[in-house]
Structures are given as C-alpha cells and as structure tokens.
Amino acid sequence: MSGIKLKKYCLALDLKDDAKIIESYKSYHQNVWPEINKSIKDSGIKEVEIYLTGNRLFMIIEADDSFSFDKKAIMDAENSKVQQWEKLMWTFQKGLPNTKKGTKWVLMNRIYNLNK
C-alpha cells in the first residue's frame, strides 16, 4: 500500500453495561460474518480496529479516497446481510449519553497530534 495516503477516522459508541452482553459482543467480533468484512473493504476502508474499555467502544478506521460515510450508508442500506448484522449489533449497543436517541457510532474530533 505504499504511496497511498489513508485518512483516519475515530468513532465512539457504548455497549449496554452488562458483562454478558459485552462478552457476546466481543464473541461476535471474533467471528465477523464474511459478508460484513467484504462490505467494509468494498467501501474503501483498508483497516478497522475496535477497542473496548468498560462498556465504551473506540473504533479506528483507515480508508482511501474512495471512502465516504454517505457512500457507505447507501451501500449498507442496499445490503440485507449488513442490515441483519446492524440490527443484531444494536441489541448490544447504546448511544453515547450526549447523542440523539438511535445514534450509533459518533465521529470524534482529534484534539492532539504529537507530530503537528
């Protein structure tokens, strides 16, 4: 991937604060459905990492210039397997306290960079 400049996006979301729910969510992410991984890659996303502390999730996305959240939303709306996955994941997730009801992953703003 040398020479390709990737853009980084960081997002946050909460899980329901229940140990069994959190373990189930982690288990699903050990075996993400192949169709979900394909849809992620097809959107221009090159790397995704999700971190967990307590019940707070932090996701880092690295994507090429073909990626946009609007394009991904359209692709997801047209993909029944992604819709099935999202519906299932929402049973484990809850929005951040500072968001409107039903809001899922929230884009975060970078406030510090060591090299800038």
Functional labels for PLM-detected ranges:
Residues 106-112:
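Eukaryote-biased recognition of C-terminal alpha-helical segments
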Residues 15-17, 65:
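Beta-strand elements of well-folded, non-transmembrane domains
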Residues 21-45:
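Short amphipathic alpha-helical segments
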Residues 79, 115-116:
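Charge-rich, low-complexity N-terminal segments
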Residues 8-14:
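Active-site-flanking beta-strand signature of metal-NTP-handling nucleotidyl enzymes
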Residues 1-7:
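Polybasic/polar functional segments that serve as interface/processing modules
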